[in-house]
Amino acid sequence: MKVVSLFSGAGGLDLGFKKAGHNILWANDIDKDAVATYRENIGNHIVCEDICNIDPVQIPDCDIVIGGFPCQGFSVANMKRHIEDERNELYKQLIRVIKAKNPKFFLAENVKGLMNLAKGKVFEMILADFRGLGYNVQAQVLNAADFGVPQTRQRVIIIGVRNDIDFEYHYPMPTHDKHEKNGLKKWVSVSKALSDLPDPDMPNDIPNHEYSKYKLQFNGYLGHRPLDHDKPAPTVTARGDNKGGVVILPHPNGQRRMSCRELASVQSFPVDFKFSGNRSSIYRQIGNAVPPVLGYAVAKMFNEYKGD
């Protein structure tokens, strides 16, 4: 199906949709490095521009609108009073584009914590906004580890099906399990995910295989505690330390931080996926991304639709 992608970043979600056979007509992001990465790996159909300045007429008609909108600007007060918060404004842009393009379906991805803001009231308002556009809306939390991503990353996936479309979206069934229950494969460990990568300190031609020299100080906080190499990594995030920077997970050997390439592998990006920008920018792009393997899992379920 024809897809329009908003808040595309480096293209993790888009890569999953592309692998599932969908045709991404148009994408958008404001981050120049992320857009350069997207163009290098996915296509030139991405527009580097503030979505607030884009007229929907410039966006092609499509079957699906996809995107992971920022959630930091949300509060009940903001939702009720329409207080202008820069990041809340981006959510309104998603609503604006869906309303203008009227796609058959939409998919919105966000952090699990969005469901708990103001005891769930903000999330209820968001779902109500989507339903007000004329869509049957459902939401479910998926753990990326359950689909083969070497990371316990939980995300809420919101699916909208236009009211006149005779289709029920089914969320993908897990392929992996922590305890290998029901014949499922065992969660992919971080050590397995990194096993094919050479030591970044040795000569190699692996792209983006440099790492931060920021000293490891294990204190129990995310990014500052040893990893269990036999388990998936904790959530890779671009926001999480007390300075608002990128949390760079330590390598399982406990001697250094993960390289950009290693962190990308934990996010399930293929090894030939090349990132643009300086090291900090690349770490941020990786942390903000939807794991492509999870993107593929949710994207392929749209293939069950057999309409026009």
Each language-model region and where it sits:
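Conserved SAM-binding strand-loop segment of SAM-dependent methyltransferases
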Residues: 43-50
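C-terminal target-recognition/interaction regions appended to catalytic cores
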Residues: 199-308
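Conserved proline-anchored active-site loop of SAM-dependent methyltransferases
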Residues: 4-17, 51, 61-78, 105-110, ...
